[in-house]
């Protein structure tokens, strides 16, 4: 593990942190003793005496440099935002994703025989991923509060309220299929300030997912920069910008989750039958991250996870649905919980759950009309004198 950590920190330069933030602590509930000898965010990360992030700005502080394919993660972020705190946080999370990707490839899949607050069994790799992400947020010095699906309580990370962020994450979505060698991933959303309740997904300033499969990728979007962007982990341990998605087109690809709901949700059964009749390509792995990511990569398709009287909502709004909704909508797609975008749902409790669909415009219109009779996205037909 020490070797993997060391290789991750090679040639990484992060923006300077104000000394006033140097005392931030990882929450006491996070035991990092096992990581002490090979800390990912310790002295091995080279800190500069000057900020390494140079952003070209006009007088009104608008960005004047366009990001390009081939940019490193640091180069991309320096061009995409003037917020050095956000740059640092996203860089630190990138370091954590890199290490989690290595551990997923080499992990033992034995269970720890423990469960989280929600009752889900945690695997050893879940626990490690959780620790690494909390450590990354602590080391960023710009995270005020954080919580995870495995530790669903606000943890004070010691960062500032003004100019700082609060982060919610699912450390390893799909950990139960690691042993099958399917792709799995990490999801996180970034909100400004110190609030993770009383907010909506549209309030996010950034969201991202890490995908650990044949390739390790870091897919992110920023509120003030167009598109959703994919970074590939190269052999030398650097993230390289390889894809920009700004449009989700129409195409016959479907990814239906929670199919047991079709037994007592006739409208969902009708929708699934439509996909089959129209000869859609079925691509579903059971891992939400790769299943949603394919819509961004292929630039087409639909993902659904629908509820019924006996198949209740399982997907968590804060940790999964809102961050992925942000990525999809920044990519030019749409999201829905049936009557509105998932980004417009207020997070009232950390454990709020919902049904969801992500996809192209026409697919989301079809989803809403089939399940609820009408769609907010469909343009009204002119009548009377307006016709």
UniProtKB/Swiss-Prot annotation:
Signal peptide: none annotated. Mg(2+) 2 binds at residues 149, 170, 172. Binds 3 Mg(2+) ions per subunit. One of its GO terms (molecular function) is fructose 1,6-bisphosphate 1-phosphatase activity. Keywords: Calvin cycle, Carbohydrate metabolism, Chloroplast, Disulfide bond, Hydrolase, Magnesium, Metal-binding, Plastid, Transit peptide. Gene3D superfamilies: 3.40.190.80, Fructose-1,6-Bisphosphatase, subunit A, domain 1. Disulfide bonds join 109-114. It is found in: Plastid, Chloroplast. Its main location: plastid. Mg(2+) 3 binds at residues 170, 173, 320. It catalyses: D-sedoheptulose 1,7-bisphosphate + H2O = D-sedoheptulose 7-phosphate + phosphate. Pathway: Carbohydrate biosynthesis; Calvin cycle. Mg(2+) 1 binds at residues 120, 149. GO terms for biological process: fructose 1,6-bisphosphate metabolic process; fructose 6-phosphate metabolic process; fructose metabolic process; gluconeogenesis; reductive pentose-phosphate cycle; sucrose biosynthetic process. Its EC number is 3.1.3.37. Its cofactor is Mg(2+). Pfam families: FBPase (PF00316), FBPase_C (PF18913). PROSITE patterns: FBPASE. Substrate binds at residues 173-176, 284, 314. GO terms for cellular component: chloroplast; cytoplasm. Belongs to the FBPase class 1 family. Homodimer. This is Sedoheptulose-1,7-bisphosphatase, chloroplastic.
